[in-house]
Amino acid sequence: MTSQKINISKIFPVFLTFIVMGFVDIVGVSTGYIQKDFELSDTLAQFIPFMVFIWFFVFSIPVGVLQDKIGKKRMMNIGLFVTLVGLLIPFIYYSFISVLIAFIGIGIGNTIVQVAANPLLQEVVSQKKLSSFLSLSQFVKAITSLLGPIVATFAALKYGDWKWVLIVYAVVTLLSILWLSTTKIEEKIKSEIPASFSSCMKLLTNKFVLAMVIAIFFIVGADVGMNSNIQGFLMKLHGYSLENASYGISIYFTALMISRFVGAILLQFLKPIFFLVSTTILALAGILLIIFSTTGIMAQVAIFIVGLGAGNLFPLIFSIAINGMPSRSNEISGLLVMAIVGGALVPPLMGVVSTSTGIIGSLIILALCFIFLLFIPFVKSND
């Protein structure tokens, strides 16, 4: 969209898809409950996020190529439907196998939603406002991520079943499908050349694009690793119960939500690269504070600080990459979403390290993910 005029009637249904996008974060609090229900080890439990996020690596580029042919809105509705099916499975039949199948469905659906969402938003807002609106969309997504652990914990305590949150999510997903389907969005931004697997992979020869892809890998890996291990941090470092530790996830997502709302405002004035470095340093400071925390309250404050720092990293990288090559947005979106596989690989690594060296080792893994981002300003495009 090149016009500065903003059509709210088109932005709202697109923003609702970002709420559905946030449903994938339920894997964090779900991991704790599933581990307890089926008496899983730390290492095995961390393969639940793996079953969600591995599909970003498998399907992102094919989805980007298909999206180039059938359109962003149609691709989005396919992703929403697959997500809906995945959300319903554990409520219908609950076993470890059915949970894995459900999260595979949620992962595949979310992959499609993520590939389609940012380019679709690009169609309804101006290029100049894209960075700000991407942060605002992530703020909307963070509302879901914040409420998920609260609803799941409430359902577990009140009704003895955390899975009621999945029914709530399924209803919202159905509403999103219906609203988007009845909203007319003219897709004007077209690829200069037809997208293909080879054209996507060729973009990786651009050092800047490659750096952006690696950055997304570490950002999402750190985010999912943080989300799915907050309960463990508070339980093992400070003796919290599972239910009380679950509220730590909501503290994290509250910080993400605040960070993204403030980021949407600040990015009207600040350069994205400067903001990227500043917030990365803040996230690193939070990780160090968790490591050296002496009380549960101190650890919770540190978790909040990590969330404040990490909140805008994903939309910043996405907007920098897409704004750099807007006519290749479908392919770039596919590559960047493929890198979300970091969410499948970093948590199991953290689980292995935690089992062998202790919980502090898993926090060091998170710190290393953030440290990579500090080198982004030194990478220049060879385009």
Predicted regions and their residues:
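Cytoplasmic helix-loop-helix junction between adjacent transmembrane helices
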Residues: 102-139
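Extracytoplasmic gate region of multi-pass secondary transporters
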Residues: 27-28, 206-250
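Extracytoplasmic
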Residues: 9-40, 118, 226-231
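Helix-loop-helix hairpin linking two adjacent transmembrane segments in secondary transporters
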Residues: 133-185
